Structures are given as C-alpha cells and as structure tokens.
C-alpha cells in the first residue's frame, strides 16, 4: 500500500482522526512524571532540528522513558477545553505509546511541542511541518501517517487562531473547527457568548466520573504542561484522571494504528 498516495486519517481536506494531549512519560520506581516536550526554538525563533533529533534519540534510549501518553480523538470531539465523549470512552482511548524508532519518537515530540507552544510564529510552524514531512518520508508507516495528520491539523489550527498567513498553508487540512468558532465568539457580547459556548464548545458527557482508582495511591504522579489554547483540557480533573491511569496502570502499546 502506498501510504503517500492517500492518508488514511483524512477525508478531502479535513483530518478525521488525530492524537491529542501528547506528553512524555518518565518513570523511576513509584514516581511518574508526564511533561510536554521542549520546543527547541533557538534565539532567532527558528526550530533547532539537531537538538530536537538528539532529544528524541536520548528519550528513546533512556531507561526511565516509558513512552508518550496521548488520546486519539475524532476531530469533532475536541471542544477546546474538554472532549465530547463519555468518561469510559476517554479512559479506554488514552494510551501509553512506546514508539519503536526515533522517527516516531520525534514526531510525537513535535506534536507535544506544538500543543504547548506559547509564542508560535508562522515561520516556526512551517518549520515543524517541514520536519514532520521529512520524518514521514524517511519512515512511511501507519503510525507516522497518523502522527503527520495530527501535526498538520494542529499547525492549521494554530495558524488560524493566531491569524498567521503563509503560502504553505494551502497544503494543510482544515484546522479543528471548534477553535474557529471559539475565536469568532470572542467578539460577541458576554451573554450571547456564554450561550453560544454552551451550545457548541462544551460537553456534558464527562459527568459519570467517580473517585480515583485506589491502585493509583501507591504512586507519585506529576504532570507538567504549558498553558496554551491547545492545552485547556489539562484543567479537567476527569481528563487528568484518565491520563494518570494510562501512565501508571496500563501496559504500553507499540503501535497506534
């Protein structure tokens, strides 16, 4: 199958499936830390590919590296600050992914860096895109195709959110639509804005969550991220609970697709 011909996770110019909330996970005895990947931006605001590649290799070969925690979602399920899915669904989908090569590891790092990029620029986002395309062409596979679709969709979302213009945007799929709506609602008056947000950017499905699993009490778990428009979900205790459970109790998966 020619993976370059027709991405399995896209339809027309819209990505249907993508990985979200990607964090690096490290473990040492009963201590577990989930944190975002560094952005590897140099003093000139450009991506330092050499350091990014070195970081991915170091992570992959570290004895404390457990993998990446992430949640595969349908694009329409992302509601900016939550996911439109029931707790048992997000609990099942959230996985601890252990890439089997440096290409997949670096692509996960790129997604994590994009989600946590506090001050992006159009040129920086395109540099991430170029690097992700290079990585996919080096190692085309179902997983790298899935990750590349995520990179493209997040970059498209950030381009629109920050009002960036760039010629290469035409090759990107459409960004996450809930963020387009969320941005447009910023100009509405408060009463109308709250009503519209409640209708289109909120979910009431994550409401059947009970207390945490008692097995988790034996571990120390810390989660670190940068507050951006793409990481509002980390304020949800229910989403944090599913991430924590995946990091501490689930066996790692070696493939996503």
Swiss-Prot record:
**Cited Pfam families:** Herpes_UL7
Q: Where in the cell is it found?
A: Virion; Virion tegument; Host cytoplasm; Host Golgi apparatus
Principal place of residence: virion
Q: Which UniProt keywords apply?
A: Host cytoplasm, Host Golgi apparatus, Virion, Virion tegument
**One term under GO cellular component:** host cell Golgi apparatus
Q: List the disulfide bonds.
A: none
Query: Is-annotated flag, keyword Ribonucleoprotein?
Result: no
Q: Indicate yes or no for the key word Nucleus.
A: no
The family note in this entry says: Belongs to the herpesviridae cytoplasmic envelopment protein 1 family.
Functionally, this protein is described as follows: Plays a critical role in cytoplasmic virus egress. Participates in the final step of tegumentation and envelope acquisition within the host cytoplasm.
Question: What name does this protein carry?
Answer: Cytoplasmic envelopment protein 1
């Amino acid at each position: 199958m020619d993976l370059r011909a027709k991405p399995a996770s896209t339809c027309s110019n819209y990505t249907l499936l993508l990985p979200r909330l990607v964090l690096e996970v490290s473990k040492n005895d009963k201590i577990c830390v989930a944190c975002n990947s560094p952005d590897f931006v140099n003093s000139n605001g450009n991506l330092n590919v050499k350091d990014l590649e070195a970081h991915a290799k170091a992570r992959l070969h570290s004895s404390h590296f457990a993998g990446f925690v992430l949640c595969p979602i349908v694009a329409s399920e992302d509601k900016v600050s939550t996911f439109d899915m029931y707790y048992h669904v997000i609990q099942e989908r959230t996985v601890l992914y252990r890439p089997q090569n440096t290409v997949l590891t670096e692509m996960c790092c790129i997604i994590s860096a994009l989600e946590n990029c506090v001050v992006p620029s159009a040129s920086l986002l395109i540099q991430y895109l170029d690097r992700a395309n290079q990585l996919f062409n080096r190692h085309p596979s179902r997983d790298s195709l899935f990750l590349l679709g995520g990179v493209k969709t997040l970059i498209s979302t950030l381009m629109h959110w920050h009002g960036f213009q760039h010629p290469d945007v035409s090759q990107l799929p459409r960004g996450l639509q809930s963020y387009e709506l969320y941005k447009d609602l910023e100009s509405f008056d408060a009463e109308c804005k709250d009503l519209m947000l409640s209708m289109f950017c909120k979910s009431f499905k994550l409401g059947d969550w009970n207390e945490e699993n008692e097995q988790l009490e034996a571990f120390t778990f810390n989660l670190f991220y940068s507050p951006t428009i793409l990481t509002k979900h980390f304020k949800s205790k229910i989403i944090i609970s599913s991430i924590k459970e995946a990091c501490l109790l689930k066996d790692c998966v070696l493939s996503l697709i």
